[in-house]
Amino acid sequence: RQVSTPRFPAAVTEVTLPPGARVPYPAGAYAFIAQLVWVLSGQLTLADGPVVHALAAGDTFELGEPRPREFRNDGAGDCRYVVVVTRTATP
């Protein structure tokens, strides 16, 4: 669910990821953007290239340089998180 309006300088999106869901992104999806993930409830497993992070409610994670990533819900209930995206440069 898009939270921000088109006039706001960042895209703010609330996501609900059901149990067992996996969402992979190629490295190219992160070119020219900065991204912050904030977990509101549940558990989020974030594979950041070869490194795997287990995030819980209240945790935040700033994504660094572009690399393949996968968002997973390995928990028993829904995971709700917010993604904030800003542009870092013009392609």
Could you describe each region identified by the protein language model?
Residues R1-A27, A34, V84-V85, A89:
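A short glycine-rich, His/Asp/Glu-containing loop-to-beta-strand
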Residues F8, A76-G77:
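Short strand-connecting beta-turns/loops that link adjacent beta-strands
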Residues E14, A29-L46:
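Short, conserved beta-strand element in jelly-roll/cupin
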Residues Y25, L46-A47, R69-G75:
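Short beta-strand His + acidic residue motifs that chelate non-heme Fe in jelly-roll/DSBH
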Residues G49-P66:
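Short acidic-glycine-tyrosine-enriched beta hairpin
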Residues E62-E65, R69, Y81-P91:
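Amphipathic alpha-helical interface segments
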